[in-house]
């Protein structure tokens, strides 16, 4: 599968989740957007792994996002995928408009975080963002929206 970056959009109830070494985090009811990279082996098939994990909740957590995917409080609504070989995950995270969940999903970079909270459905804003970045990446880049 192609390589790229993605935003996973989740809807959730108010809850508290133990997230490994980060400890317990309180999440307000609403929407969360997680910016991830799929430049390694398997590429964007990582998004399909996220869908499966959220549906079956049958594996141990490997990444920060897995703690949310394993919780019955969170449901994956869709994923926005940008097909690219460029490392633009942090660029995407810096342009997200939601409230950053500090330190979540950003242990391997200097970003404040890669998880963002929105009180209302941010679909239109995220769609505009990924379309804009995809255009800047040039003709070899394109965007898909996947639904579980």
Name what the model sees in each region:
Residues 1-2, 7-27:
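An N-terminal domain-cap segment
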Residues 33-38:
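GIY-YIG nuclease signature motif recognition
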Residues 39-134:
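Aromatic/basic micro-patches that form nucleic-acid/chromatin recognition or nuclease catalytic surfaces
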Residues 138-147:
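Conserved short beta-strand edge segments in small beta-sheet-based binding/regulatory domains
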